[in-house]
């Protein structure tokens, strides 16, 4: 019996559509002689799997549909929940292996500032940067290039 691969795509962010395209590319290039491949569309409201041309809901309790259980997941989800550690934690809890890094590393690298803080002590060259917090109000009239340079992180 060939391993059953769920190619997950979609997600909860503005990257949803590009993720669907990425998933389609993966679907087009997986060796169907070696693997039994299923497209799984992840959306905030529902997760659906395509079986014989029909879309059916995934049972979230065990990531299955009808009598189909997946052996491995190919993660093509951009943004949340595919790149921030959420989906990785979910599959870890079910014991289903997946492509990509661990939940912990995914969560870290999703936050670019935290990633740079983590890497900086290891002597890697870092670009100078400024952190802007969405809730902060910025007086753009008072900000100049010189002002920004004076407040850059090392």
Where are these regions (language model features)?
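Single conserved hydrophobic/aromatic residue that forms the stacking wall/gate
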Residues: 147-154
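ATP-binding N-terminal substructure of ATP-dependent carboxylate-amine bond-forming enzymes
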Residues: 1-104, 108-110, 114, 121, ...
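Short, surface-exposed amphipathic charged segments that create phosphate/polyanion-binding patches used
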Residues: 117, 144-145
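Rossmann-fold dehydrogenase core element
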Residues: 126
């Amino acid at each position: 019996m060939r391993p059953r691969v769920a190619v997950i795509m979609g997600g909860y962010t503005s990257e949803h559509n590009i993720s669907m395209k990425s998933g389609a590319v993966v679907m087009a290039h997986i060796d169907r002689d070696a693997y039994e491949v299923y497209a799984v569309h992840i959306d905030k409201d529902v997760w659906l799997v395509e079986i014989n041309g029909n879309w059916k809901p995934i049972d979230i309790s065990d990531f299955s549909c009808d009598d189909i259980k997946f052996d491995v997941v190919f993660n093509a989800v951009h943004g949340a929940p595919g790149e921030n550690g959420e989906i990785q934690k979910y599959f870890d809890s079910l014991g289903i292996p997946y492509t990509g890094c661990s939940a912990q590393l995914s969560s870290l690298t999703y936050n670019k500032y935290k990633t740079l803080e983590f890497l900086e002590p290891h002597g890697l060259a870092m670009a100078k940067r400024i952190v802007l917090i969405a809730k902060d109000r910025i007086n753009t009239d008072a900000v100049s290039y010189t002002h920004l340079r004076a407040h850059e992180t090392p």
